[in-house]
Design a protein with these regions (language model features):
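Hydrophobic alpha-helical segments
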Residues: 110-257
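Short helix-loop junctions at transmembrane helix boundaries
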Residues: 40-54, 123-155, 212-229, 604-667
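Alpha-helical transmembrane segments
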Residues: 34-62, 241, 248-251, 284, ...
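Short cytosolic juxtamembrane segments of multi-pass membrane proteins
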Residues: 2-5, 180-194, 570-571, 661-669
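Basic-flanked hydrophobic alpha-helices used for secretion and membrane insertion
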Residues: 314-555
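Peri-transmembrane interface segments
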Residues: 19-26, 37-66, 81-84, 92-93, ...
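N-terminal Sec/SRP start-transfer signal
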Residues: 1-32, 196-201, 210, 245-294, ...
Length: 669
């Protein structure tokens, strides 16, 4: 055969089947563009000096892995669908004298043509939109914006190589599938339909039970660490349960409707129900896949959106003041207090020299221990099970009243307490052999920021008149476990605070090296302005990745729906032809189409929203790890995301229903 025979035949086949191949090629273009953008941003954030670049690069690299894996899985599904639609055509080639080797040549050139078109177009799109993506990322992480345009040739080659690898896998998978078929199966494969399965109540009930268990987990899991683990257990149960309900439950529903003769034998319902029942097993699996993808998009955008929108609240919760200084002092209590005063005086001098009028100053001391808590007895023993331990904080009543705006009064044998991630139901507590009456439970967030919750261990805060007296009963090295806190807000701009942070740190290091703060002393500095970059690097990077992955899953959802509707349209074409011959008009056909399509489309969206509503509590528990706890803001974010997606979904419904109708009616609407 002539050299250009196979490429020409492959190109003609693609043109002839453009209704199938155009969405597929556009999807491949979009995936190639996303891959290039992710590679570009990963390289840019690593080498450009962008604030929080290291964290963002790591986040984007995880995103690249997810995109490549999902691309392989999804394009394999799409390619399998195209092969199924093309097998009759390949069968004709076989009857006309072509061997499977010849057909493989055609299939090879089809893949080469699609690869070249999609990769060149996709990378071109990626290059064109890479700067826009960079600007979006810079805005999300609140970094300086650069309008310089760069083209990295190495990234173009890497992206082309990744796409080539994916298409090679698709080609090998397709050749194996074609090689297993004989001429008769090639000719009839398009007509092979799955037999209507019998209603399986057992599978449907198991599916419902799985969803109930998953919902129960989501509603009852309290601790963020448990939520992080149990969330994935719930996800697995939801995925399996959804498939069971859509496959078995939808079949059962159709069988029940068919038994209802008054309903079933109306012309508005007869065609829709019978056609759905004929292929319901495959239809149910397809609907379940769409439902899972929609749920992934909603959950991802809900979580990432809530995280980013609540970032500023989270930042100020994590850093209650612009500057926080923590000192761990050695020596006896008196010496430790003297060293802390010297430490604070140096800080004061530094900020005065920088013309900073500080405000909202807090200066206090607390003791921190890991203790065994058995019933109402607190001790320092380490011979108990791990679940009996808690972090216990001791702070003086004077400091509590001063910085929490209270005026509490306690007797020497009385204490105030607060607990996180543990329940304490006793009216007293015993420490060092002494019993103390619990007067009341009080909030302590003004002294201990909510970020301490991220450590996920049980915490008990104890406020007393004299904490040294309490802890002296079980600790001879009191200062070894004592922390001195000095924090305040700055009158300087965020930029000035960032610029002077390194000078401040170096000044404190120099003083410490000279032994100015005593032996055995260590300290730490926290700056809200300086740490903001890394903070938004994490939150902005996660939100950006959520946007990219959601876009990818949306493309997959649309293409699955589109392919599904084309397949069902061709399968229903002969049935509607019969209906037209017995007198059904195009208007009646469209009415039947709408009846079927509304049923098919509303179920995945309805179940996805249901999944999201039950997932919201456990997602909110996980968000507390990042100190995002504004419930009203989180719920508003969820409502907005659902509303936006609903509009998008309805648009997809209208487009795909028109495609389906054009096929079954053989006339334009």
């Amino acid at each position: 055969m002539k050299l250009g025979f196979y490429p020409k035949l492959a190109a003609d086949s693609i043109k002839k089947n453009k209704k199938l191949y155009l969405p597929y090629i556009l999807t491949c273009c979009g995936i190639s563009a996303m891959q290039y953008i992710m590679f570009y941003l990963s390289d840019y954030t690593e080498n450009s000096g962008m604030t929080g670049g290291r964290i963002i690069t790591t986040t984007l690299n995880y995103g690249i892995i997810i995109i490549v894996i999902f691309s392989i899985i999804f394009l394999n599904y799409s390619n399998s669908f195209l092969l199924r639609r093309r097998q009759k055509e390949f069968g004709i080639y076989n009857i006309l004298g072509m061997s499977k080797k010849n057909i493989a040549h055609i299939y090879l050139w089809e893949n080469i043509i699609i690869y070249l078109i999609s990769t060149v177009s996709g990378i071109t799109m990626g290059i064109a939109f890479s700067k826009l993506a960079e600007l979006l990322l810079a805005r999300l992480i609140k970094d300086n914006i650069s309008y310089d345009f760069t083209l990295n040739k190495d990234l173009v080659l890497v992206c082309a190589a990744v796409s080539a690898f994916i298409f090679l896998l698709l080609f090998v998978r397709g050749i194996i599938a074609l090689w297993k078929l004989n001429t008769l199966s090639l000719m009839k494969s398009e007509n092979f339909g799955e037999k209507p399965p019998k209603a399986n109540y057992l599978i449907a009930v198991i599916g419902v039970l799985m969803l109930c268990v998953a919902y129960y987990i989501a509603l009852t899991t309290e601790k963020p660490l448990d939520a992080l683990v149990m969330f994935f257990v719930a996800v697995i149960l939801v995925v399996i349960g959804t498939y069971m309900i859509f496959i078995a439950g939808s079949v059962t529903m159709c069988k029940i409707l068919q038994k209802n003769k008054k309903y079933y034998y109306q012309k508005d319902h007869f065609v829709a129900v019978s056609s759905m029942a004929y292929r319901m097993k495959r239809n149910g699996a397809g609907l379940a896949s769409v439902c899972i993808l929609i749920t992934m998009v909603l959950v991802m955008m809900f979580g990432a959106g809530s995280l980013y929108i609540g970032a500023e609240d989270s930042l100020h919760t994590t850093y209650p003041r612009d500057f926080t200084f923590v000192m761990y002092a050695g020596g006896d209590q008196e010496t430790a207090n003297e060293n802390f005063n010297v430490f604070c005086n140096d800080i004061d001098e530094f900020f005065i020299n920088h013309n900073d009028n500080r405000k909202d100053i807090q200066k206090y001391t607390y003791a921190h221990y890991n203790m065994n808590v058995t019933d109402n007895v607190f001790d320092r023993g380490f011979d108990k099970p791990a679940d009996k331990y808690a972090e216990v904080y001791f702070i003086s009543l004077a400091d509590y009243n001063k910085y929490c705006g209270e005026n509490k009064v306690l007797e020497d044998n009385q204490v105030l307490i607060n607990t996180i991630y543990t329940q304490y139901s006793y009216s007293n507590l015993i420490i060092g052999g002494e019993s103390y009456v619990i007067r009341e439970f009080v909030p302590t967030d003004d002294l201990f920021p909510n970020r301490d919750k991220a450590y996920l261990t049980p915490k008990i805060y104890i406020i007393a008149n004299d904490i040294n007296k309490i802890i002296s009963g079980f600790d001879n090295e009191i200062t070894h476990h004592t922390k001195f806190i000095y924090r305040f807000n700055s009158s300087l701009s965020q930029d000035k605070q960032c610029r002077m942070f390194n000078d401040l740190y170096n000044n404190m290091v120099a003083n410490n090296n000279r032994g100015k703060y005593g032996s055995g002393t260590s300290w730490a500095i926290e700056s809200l302005a300086f740490d903001r970059a890394d903070f938004y690097g994490i939150y902005g990077g996660i939100f950006f990745l959520g946007i990219i992955l959601s876009a990818l899953f949306l493309v997959a959802t649309v293409l699955i729906i589109y392919f599904k509707q084309i397949a069902e349209g061709y399968e229903d074409e002969s049935r509607f032809t019969v209906m037209k011959k017995i007198g059904m008009t195009n208007r009646e056909i469209q009415k039947n189409v709408n009846s079927q399509m509304k049923t098919v489309f509303i179920l995945p969206l309805a179940f996805a929203i249901l999944h999201l509503c039950f997932a919201a509590p456990i997602i909110m528990r996980m968000l507390t790890i990042f100190s995002v706890e504004n419930t009203s803001l989180i719920l508003i974010t969820m409502a907005v995301i659902v509303a936006i997606f609903r509009v998008f979904y309805i648009t997809v419904y209208k487009i795909t229903s028109n495609v389906y109708y054009e096929i079954v009616s053989k006339s334009k609407i």
